């Protein structure tokens, strides 16, 4: 039975003080300017999420503070097909704000949450100073048979460069007896991921244009 409490809903509840309704003081408190980085949950928050089956193995929370020129954030869930990344949806999900720079919030900052669902689909939710966004779960593979699974989530602060995709998650599944650990940088060299039954990636891209 699929959970009825997706990660983003729980994080909004458990991090209510940190989010501060997306005020200028939060949720960017942990992210330095021009970076995206893991959001450090305290033990109480981890325990609460774990009670709903959300752990560091299947969920991710990141805080970000985009460059001053950024007006949009795009999120893409891709699947490796014949050595090439293919978007699993008809379009790239994203949101932002347009208009003169002086009319926008002082900073584009927020919290991004990712959850791997039981059918292998991926859900993303963003709360930010530009507003909120949630995608329809993408990349479902309910009939996939696998015996091995490996994941790589963003674990270190990453500098944001406009219009350059940043891989934040790689998830691989196979039916063999062993599987090598994943490296996020393999997103840029997909040939390193050959031989796996299913590989999915999540990237985020900050842009000056919607």
Features from the language model and the residues they span:
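Surface-exposed turn/loop modules enriched in turn-prone residues
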Residues: 74-104
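C-terminal motif of bacterial Sec signal peptides marking the signal peptidase cleavage site
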Residues: 18-21
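Short N-terminal edge-element motif at the start of the domain
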Residues: 24-85
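Compositionally biased, intrinsically disordered/low-complexity regions enriched for serine, proline
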Residues: 3, 24, 162-164
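Hydrophobic helical h-region of N-terminal Sec-dependent signal peptides
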Residues: 11-15
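Bacterial N-terminal signal peptides that target proteins for export
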Residues: 2-9
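Extracytoplasmic electrostatic interaction patches
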Residues: 93-210
């Amino acid at each position: 039975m699929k959970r009825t409490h997706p990660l983003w809903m729980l994080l909004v509840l458990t991090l209510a003080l940190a989010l501060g309704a997306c005020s200028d003081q939060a949720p960017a408190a942990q992210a330095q300017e021009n970076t995206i980085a893991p959001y450090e949950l305290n033990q109480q928050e981890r325990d609460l999420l774990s009670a709903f089956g959300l752990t560091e193995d299947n969920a991710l929370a990141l805080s970000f503070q985009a460059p001053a020129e950024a007006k949009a954030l795009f999120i893409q869930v891709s699947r490796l097909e014949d050595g090439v990344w293919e978007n699993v949806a008809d379009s790239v999900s994203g949101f932002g704000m347009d208009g003169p720079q002086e009319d926008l919030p002082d900073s584009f900052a927020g919290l991004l949450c990712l959850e791997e669902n039981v059918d292998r689909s991926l859900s993303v939710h963003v709360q930010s100073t530009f507003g909120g966004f949630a995608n329809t779960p993408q990349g479902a593979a309910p009939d996939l048979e696998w015996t091995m699974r490996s994941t790589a989530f963003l674990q270190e602060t990453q500098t944001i460069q406009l219009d350059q995709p940043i891989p934040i998650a790689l998830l691989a599944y196979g039916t063999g007896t062993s599987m090598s650990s994943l490296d996020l940088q393999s997103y840029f060299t997909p040939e390193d991921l050959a031989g796996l039954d299913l590989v999915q990636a999540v990237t985020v891209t900050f842009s000056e244009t919607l």
